[in-house]
């Protein structure tokens, strides 16, 4: 199983597909102690979190648990439903200009990455992911999405404050 997570982290879609063809039950595999950053998380969570959305899409098509939430551990006391991970990723990957240290602006994320993140999130919603689930701090999907927008909307509003009426 650790090998599956390593292949996932490398973004090896074909290797993951082959594993699922041989062992369909692996679709809901949960990471063990290593790597620590993935401890207790599902393949789908790790695929979304690491930005391997083509693999996330495959896992969803193969029946991954859309309502999974990991158990708290000493290393990772914060637990989040996979739908919150997907919602946060969809906002995080949205196209926007970001200001770099040198004052120059550049586009963050590509149109393709943004569209893919949104597609995965929307697919999960359409397939019935439970949007009422709460994370270990009591936060909801809506709160997660709003928190993620802090990177997108406030800077845009502040940079355009001259547009007051």
Predicted regions and their residues:
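Ankyrin repeat domain, specifically the short helix-to-loop turn at the C-terminus of the second helix
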Residues: 18-26, 57-66, 122-130, 156-164
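Extended HEAT/HEAT-like alpha-solenoid repeat tracts in very large eukaryotic scaffold/adaptor proteins
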Residues: 39-40, 113-120, 124
């Amino acid at each position: 199983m650790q090998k599956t997570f390593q292949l996932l982290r490398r973004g090896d879609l074909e290797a993951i597909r082959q594993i699922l063809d041989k062992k369909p039950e692996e679709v809901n595999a949960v990471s063990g102690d290593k790597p620590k950053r993935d401890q207790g998380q599902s393949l789908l969570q790790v695929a979304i979190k690491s930005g391997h959305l083509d693999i996330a899409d495959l896992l969803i098509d193969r029946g991954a648990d859309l309502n999974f939430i990991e158990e708290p551990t000493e290393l990772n006391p914060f637990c989040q439903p996979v739908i919150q991970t997907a919602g946060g990723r969809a906002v995080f990957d949205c196209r926007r200009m970001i200001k770099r240290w040198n004052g120059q602006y550049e586009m963050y994320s590509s149109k393709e990455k943004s569209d893919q993140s949104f597609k995965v999130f929307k697919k999960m919603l359409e397939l019935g992911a439970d949007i009422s689930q709460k994370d270990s701090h009591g936060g909801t999907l809506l709160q997660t999405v709003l928190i993620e927008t802090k990177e997108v909307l406030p800077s845009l509003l502040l940079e355009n404050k001259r547009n007051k009426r």
